[in-house]
Design a protein with these regions (language model features):
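Cell wall/extracellular polymer interaction/catalysis modules
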Residues: 1-173, 190-224
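Short beta-strand-centered segments at strand-helix junctions
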Residues: 176-193
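Acidic two-metal-ion nuclease catalytic site recognized across multiple nuclease folds
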Residues: 227
Length: 227
């Protein structure tokens, strides 16, 4: 486990500065981080405000962290899951041809989210930056509820990857579980839906985010123009 405390905005530091600088460092090398579009930084392997990271497992928990950036507003931090809930599912794809379907975990990277359904429960569709619905993933080939290095090495893809309500979804919701989709509570998704129909989504592992956070210089003054 890794000390996760550097991730969280310390007293006296403006959240826009702290989380915005982390996002900027994590965006580097992919595309310049836009300041005029809503963005989500999804951090896998650390629960919101947790002191330590944790092993990523296929369980029905919002034990990852999301940070929504909207121009003109402070960052909105929310609990989410960037992993599946189940170890197997008949609805999943058989990634290794052994006759047993394998749930998927989206690989870290940069994606586009498009709001496909707004009411009654918001749903976003994942796409690559090139516009493909074929999303890079790892699959739990041995069905032990986690991705090991052997599974990580296999370059696989998944389709129909969404961001939707999860295990605490209201009765009647079409989505309550996940075999590859990202999930969050209805309240969080309603906030995200107000940000706009198109959102850029940067997914990183917790250890990578923590290293970026350690490079952030605390700044007690808010910026002149909040972005």
């Amino acid at each position: 486990m890794t000390d996760a405390r550097p991730l969280w905005c310390p007293p006296g530091t403006h959240p826009v500065n702290h989380y915005g600088m982390i996002l900027g460092k994590l965006w580097g090398g992919l595309l310049p981080p836009p300041t005029d579009k809503p963005r989500i930084l999804a951090i896998r392997g650390v629960a919101l405000f947790a002191e330590e990271t944790h092993e990523v497992l296929s369980v029905p928990k919002y034990d990852d962290t999301g940070v929504l950036f909207v121009p003109g507003a402070e960052p909105f931090l929310f609990p989410m899951a960037t992993h599946p809930y189940q170890k197997d599912s008949r609805a999943a794809t058989d990634g290794n041809g052994d006759g047993v379907p394998d749930v998927a975990t989206v690989r870290t990277g940069l994606y586009r989210l498009t709001l496909a359904i707004e009411k009654p429960y918001p749903v976003w569709v994942f796409a690559t930056m090139a516009g493909s619905a074929s999303i890079p993933c790892s699959r739990d080939l041995n069905h032990d509820g986690k991705i090991d290095w052997r599974e990580q090495e296999k370059q696989l893809t998944a389709t129909a990857i969404l961001l939707h309500v999860g295990h605490d979804a209201p009765a009647g919701s079409e989505h309550r579980s996940s075999i590859g989709c990202a999930t969050a509570s209805l309240r969080s998704l309603e906030v995200i839906a107000r940000a706009g129909r198109q959102i850029l989504y940067r997914l990183v592992d917790a250890d990578v985010a923590i290293e970026a956070a350690k490079l952030v210089t605390p700044d007690t003054l808010p910026p002149e123009n909040v972005t």
